[in-house]
Every structure is written in C-alpha cells, then in structure tokens.
C-alpha cells in the first residue's frame, strides 16, 4: 500500500476475549469508530515488530476519513470471518 496503507487498530486489548460475542462486539466498535470519524489507538502497544513498521498503527486515537472498515475475527477450531462494514 505504501503511503496509502489503511490505518490498523485492535479492540481485544480493551474488551478481552468474549468467546462467541467477540466478533459481533468488534463489528459494533468498528461501526462506532466510523460514525465518530476516528481510528482508536492501541495504548498498550509497546513496540511494533520491524516487519510491520510500515503499517499505520498508533498508541493514540486519531482522526480518519473513511466510511468502510474491515473486521477480522478468528474463532476456535480454525473458524475465520471477514466482515466489511460501511457507515450509514
């Protein structure tokens, strides 16, 4: 993506593992972030693996102009889900 890399964040650090509800809660949080026009920071992030240094990850919440978000969830037993959401 180069300079156009989409912002990256994570919610699990703040909500813990909610077992079956995790994916649904993260989808709601992604929609709320879109509604507010922000990308939530990851304040517990101490360092970034050098292999991912080009990704726009931040400890601080920052403004963002987007109407779409990609929510990725993984479950036990190899279950994976990708949900692309758009703000109304």
Where are these regions (language model features)?
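Structural signature of cysteine-dependent C-C bond-forming condensing enzymes
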Residues: 1-14, 22-76, 86-88
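Short beta-strand scaffold segments in enzyme catalytic cores
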Residues: 81-84
